[in-house]
Amino acid sequence: AFPAAKQVFEAGSDILGFDLLKACAEYSAEELARTEISQPAIMATSLAAYEAAKTLGITADMVAGHSLGEYAAMTAAGMLTLENAFRVIRERARAMGECAKAQNGAMCAVMGLSAGEIADVCEKAEGFVIPVNFNSPVQTVIAGEADAVDRAAGVFAGMGKRTAKLTVSAAFHSKFMQPAADDFK
């Protein structure tokens, strides 16, 4: 129904060397959680949705994104070609995936507390855990050592606050990604 959306997946598949559409449709949650798969899959899905919207006559006056989404936004804005975007994401995902293998990190969204309250709990937790993504005034994501993230999540649950562990392979947006940042330069 949307040939332009299909072309996004085909372009990504050609550059990455694996079938992105198959990955999105058939891979297990564990396989999709691997950074080397999840980042290109999210990128392809985001850009395919954008292309489908354009086909329907829906246009954007501006685009924005956070983290990986910044690359999709730059591509939608014409700052990166589709092919170059997938090349960049391939290298970003590779570097971050290598960091993920070298650590036991985790991330968890915390709802219903201010960033300051969340930071206070993280500071008191045993091990490394910090607030990393300030998504809204009432939702912050924490990241760090898996055990420390779990302990902090337990404190939040004890306070009656909702938490959601993210299905990711590392403590992204934390100091654990510094080797990836250095490699990606």
PLM regions: where:
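Alpha/beta catalytic cores of group-transfer enzymes, especially the acyltransferase/condensing modules
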Residues: 14-18, 27-28, 77-185
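Helix-rich "cap/lid" substructures immediately adjacent to catalytic or cofactor-binding pockets
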Residues: 1-64, 142
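An amphipathic alpha-helix/helix-turn recognition signal
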Residues: 7, 41, 67-68, 80, ...
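Gly/Ala-rich beta-loop-alpha elbow adjacent to hydrolase catalytic centers
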Residues: 46, 61-65, 69, 73, ...
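A short acidic, helix-capping loop that chelates divalent metal ions and anchors anionic groups
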Residues: 31-33, 72-75
